[in-house]
Every structure is written in structure tokens, then in C-alpha cells.
């Protein structure tokens, strides 16, 4: 059944909530920030751990976040997942502290933006598919008189790759991982509602794949969105809240209500 999954987004060493489409590689470009926490990353790690919110992730959005990420991970070793700048060279290091590592941009060529399968194969060999999460954060691409499609975006969601989300893509990638994180970059941080069409498609594309986990993020604005995702995905997809959540300065969703949902659904 659908459950609430927590996140800790780090930017310049602080816990923040950011509008996804405003992140860039340039420090000169202004990032639209919904929330900057006065509390350390370890506070949120402890909060999730004490309330048994499992499968939570720490995402390093750009440089200067390693120390903050380690602080969160060390608060409850092997409890949190970690993503952001993960490569073949450092994945072993992060797995000393994290339950799983999360990868996106590393899997694509930096110049052509093409998916490089051999990198995923090597990561799976080193980490094991049960400790590897593939981040398929995406943007909607719509053309006149055509059905919308969702294409994986890299480089802080600014660059479209050649990898389209569909049944074939998931069937292929499931050879190397058993979990996916999907940010709907177009609605991330806006608190205007989830991409219902994407959630429904995620279920459709993976309905015949056993034991695969998907966490959806982007736009959630009400605790009722847990019920909506459960309906759209037949309970197969989990949901994370960001800017709408009270622990991140939001006024739309109470953390305790999300925890209660989990306890009632998974008692």
C-alpha cells in the first residue's frame, strides 16, 4: 500500500525546499527557495527514524553538501538513502553510511546526454541491485496532436536526456535495480498538486514487474494526496512531501498526519 516517505534536500549545506525548475549549475543564477531550515540535517534524520518513516532520502543539490549529508546519515546509520554526485568512485564510501545510493546524472554522457548502460551495470555489480536506486526525475514533453511523454532530466533537471519513461525502460532497468525515485520536475516545489497522469502511467508501466518500488515526488499539497496516489497506483507507489509539509515551513500538510497514515496502513 502507498506510504509516506520523507526527504531531506540539501543546498549549500543547509536543509532547504527549492522550486525544482530554478536549480542550475551556475552560482550566479538565483534559486527560488520556499524554505531554509534553522535546524541541522540530523534533526530531520532523527525525526524520520523515531517515527519509523522508512525509505527516506537525503539529496545533495550541488556542491558543499557532503558534510551536511554525513551529519544526517550518521544520526541513524544505514537508515537513509543518499543521492547527488554519486559515481563509481564514491558509491562504496557512501554505502558505509547509507542504506542505498541514488544515481541520475552519472548514468548519462555529459556531452550527448545519452544513457550509458555500462555505468549502471557496473554500479549494480559494486552495490548490488538492492542497494541501488535509479532516479528517473523527468519533465513532461508535449507535442501537438500527440500523447504527452516524460523524459528523464539531468543536471539539476535542466537538461533533457534521450531516456523516455515507458514500459520498456522500466523492464530494462529493473535488471539492475529494484527501486526508482521519480521527481516530476515541472511541478516540484509548487504545491499545486501532483502530476496525476504521470502517477497513473508509472503504475501502468510497472504493473507486471514484481517487487519494484517507486517513490513519487512533486507537487503534493494535501495529506489526501496519499489516498490519491494509492488510488491511481493501486497502492504500488509511495509519496514524498516537501514544501507543503509543516516541518519544512509549509501550512498544508502536517507531518503527524503523514506518520499516522503510515501507521494505520502498515500496522
From Swiss-Prot:
Provide the organism lineage as a comma list. Answer: Eukaryota, Fungi, Dikarya, Ascomycota, Saccharomycotina
Q: Which reaction does it catalyse?
A: 1-(5-phospho-beta-D-ribosyl)-5-[(5-phospho-beta-D-ribosylamino)methylideneamino]imidazole-4-carboxamide = 5-[(5-phospho-1-deoxy-D-ribulos-1-ylimino)methylamino]-1-(5-phospho-beta-D-ribosyl)imidazole-4-carboxamide
Please state what the protein is called. Answer: 1-(5-phosphoribosyl)-5-[(5-phosphoribosylamino)methylideneamino] imidazole-4-carboxamide isomerase
Top-level EC class: isomerase
Q: Where is this protein found?
A: Cytoplasm
Q: Could you tell me which PANTHER family the record lists for this protein?
A: 1-(5-PHOSPHORIBOSYL)-5-[(5-PHOSPHORIBOSYLAMINO)METHYLIDENEAMINO] IMIDAZOLE-4-CARBOXAMIDE ISOMERASE
Gene Ontology terms: cellular component:
cytoplasm
One MF term in GO for this entry? Answer: 1-(5-phosphoribosyl)-5-[(5-phosphoribosylamino)methylideneamino]imidazole-4-carboxamide isomerase activity
Q: Which UniProt keywords apply?
A: Amino-acid biosynthesis, Cytoplasm, Histidine biosynthesis, Isomerase
Top-level division of the source organism's lineage: Eukaryota
Q: In which pathway does it act?
A: Amino-acid biosynthesis; L-histidine biosynthesis; L-histidine from 5-phospho-alpha-D-ribose 1-diphosphate: step 4/9
InterPro entries linked to this entry: Aldolase_TIM, His6-like_euk, His_biosynth, Isoase_HisA-like, RibuloseP-bd_barrel
Q: Which family does it belong to?
A: Belongs to the HisA/HisF family.
Biological processes annotated in GO: L-histidine biosynthetic process; L-tryptophan biosynthetic process
The organism encoding this protein is: Kluyveromyces lactis (strain ATCC 8585 / CBS 2359 / DSM 70799 / NBRC 1267 / NRRL Y-1140 / WM37) (Yeast)
Its EC number is 5.3.1.16
Amino acid at each position: 500500500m502507498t506510504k509516506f516517505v520523507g526527504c531531506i534536500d540539501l543546498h549549500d549545506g543547509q536543509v532547504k525546499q527549492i522550486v525544482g525548475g530554478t536549480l542550475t549549475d551556475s552560482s550566479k543564477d538565483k534559486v527560488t527557495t520556499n524554505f531554509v531550515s534553522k535546524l541541522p540535517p540530523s534533526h530531520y534524520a532523527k525525526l524520520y527514524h523515531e517515527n519509523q518513516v522508512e525509505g527516506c532520502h537525503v539529496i545533495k543539490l550541488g556542491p558543499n553538501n557532503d558534510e551536511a549529508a554525513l551529519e544526517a546519515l550518521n544520526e541513524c546509520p544505514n537508515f537513509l538513502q543518499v543521492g547527488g554526485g554519486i559515481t563509481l568512485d564514491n558509491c562504496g564510501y557512501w554505502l558505509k553510511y547509507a542504506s542505498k545510493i541514488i544515481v541520475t546524472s552519472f548514468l548519462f554522457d555529459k556531452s550527448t546526454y545519452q544513457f550509458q548502460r555500462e555505468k549502471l551495470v557496473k554500479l549494480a555489480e559494486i552495490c548490488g541491485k538492492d542497494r541501488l536506486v535509479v532516479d528517473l526525475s523527468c519533465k513532461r514533453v508535449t507535442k501537438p496532436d500527440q500523447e504527452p511523454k516524460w523524459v528523464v532530466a539531468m543536471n539539476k533537471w535542466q537538461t533533457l536526456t534521450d531516456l523516455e519513461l515507458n514500459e520498456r525502460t522500466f523492464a530494462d532497468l529493473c535488471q539492475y535495480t529494484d527501486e526508482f525515485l521519480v521527481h516530476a520536475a515541472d511541478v516540484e516545489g509548487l504545491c499545486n498538486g501532483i502530476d496525476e497522469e504521470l502517477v497513473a502511467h508509472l503504475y501502468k508501466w510497472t504493473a507486471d514487474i514484481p517487487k519494484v518500488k517507486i517513490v513519487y515526488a512533486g507537487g503534493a499539497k494535501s495529506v489526501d494526496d496519499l489516498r490519491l496516489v494509492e488510488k491511481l497506483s493501486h497502492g504500488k507507489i509511495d509519496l514524498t512531501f516537501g514544501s507543503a509539509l509543516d516541518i519544512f515551513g509549509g501550512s498544508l500538510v502536517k507531518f503527524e498526519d503523514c506518520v499516522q497514515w503510515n501507521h494505520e496502513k502498515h500496522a
